[in-house]
Amino acid sequence: MYGRTNHRTWPSDPVRTVMMWPVATVETLASMSAVAEALATDEIGALCVVENDALGGIVSERDVVTHLAAGANPAHLTAGEMMSSDLITVDPEDSVLAVARLMREAQVRHLPVVEDGLIAGIVSIRDLFDVLIDGASDEGEIVFVPSGARVVVRTE
């Protein structure tokens, strides 16, 4: 099973503290059915797609649903054909908050974490949400303004 670290994490902490490792992967030639089965079995939302041990893309539950809704045959469509290959990746030392902002800007829910060209982990918006909510409940209400400045309203 795939897991996360189980200690208190703050929005300013590096994303490596919340990323999933090991990373669930599939080969580019894996069928849509195999992708869906892996997502369901591991109870995860995305898989890294690899070819010759190199990261080629990411395929998510959203990709599977989109292709099925368009009438794709699960037996004939591969992970390589479904995956997003114009990848946005993050570094393990990027902050949780910076990664959350990047996900919002890119409108994605999962990002591979890459270090020295190798897959170091994967992070989901769900992982980040937990940290951001915990941080907000400890500090009071946190409001992010467009400039990126942070305004903290203390609750008494």
What are these regions (language model features)?
Residues 1-156:
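Tandem CBS (Cystathionine beta-synthase) repeat/Bateman regulatory domains
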